[in-house]
């Protein structure tokens, strides 16, 4: 399955109710962030980064949970099972899926240092990525909308952490120049 097919398969069109809920959620977040800016609790950069994070996470949750078709409860509880299958069976589609899972939460890792307006530790970034992924995976299991697997949680957390490390390094380099 190529990236386009993955996007088409897992990103079904949103219903009217989903669009309204998404819009109301973002409007509420925007109002709260604007008040925080007005009261000088957050800088413009922090407000923009926080709003971008809210938009991104809304889209991620929508595409990984809410727009998926209900099936049966599926789970894979063996960590790194996908890497074993990739190595053993040369399953390149599974490798692509693992890499895409690493990429999925990279935008979160990029935004974290801007939200806190400072460097964000890699341990905290890993914890944030794992936490977000755990919510996604548990929701998929509870609502029967996908496969719960530890590999996704590990890959998502790793991607978030890696992106945060790179962003911290770029910010440090930019501040030196």
Predicted regions span which residues?
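Bulky hydrophobic segments
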Residues: 1-145, 150, 164-177
């Amino acid at each position: 399955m190529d990236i386009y097919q993955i996007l088409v398969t897992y990103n079904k069109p949103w219903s009217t109710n989903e669009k309204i809920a998404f819009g109301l959620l973002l409007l509420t977040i925007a109002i709260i962030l604007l008040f925080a800016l007005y009261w000088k609790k957050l800088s413009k950069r922090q407000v923009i980064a926080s709003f971008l994070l809210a938009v991104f996470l809304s889209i991620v949750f929508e595409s990984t949970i809410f727009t998926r078709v209900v099936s049966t409860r599926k789970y894979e509880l063996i960590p790194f099972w996908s890497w074993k299958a990739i190595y053993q069976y040369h399953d390149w589609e599974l490798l692509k899926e693992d890499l895409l899972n690493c990429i999925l939460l990279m935008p979160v890792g990029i935004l974290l240092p801007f939200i806190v307006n400072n460097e964000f530790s890699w341990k905290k970034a890993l914890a944030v990525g794992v936490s977000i992924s755990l919510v996604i995976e548990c929701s998929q299991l509870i609502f029967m909308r996908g496969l719960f697997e530890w590999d996704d949680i590990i890959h998502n957390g790793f991607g978030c952490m890696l992106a945060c490390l790179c962003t911290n390094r770029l910010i440090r380099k930019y501040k030196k120049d």
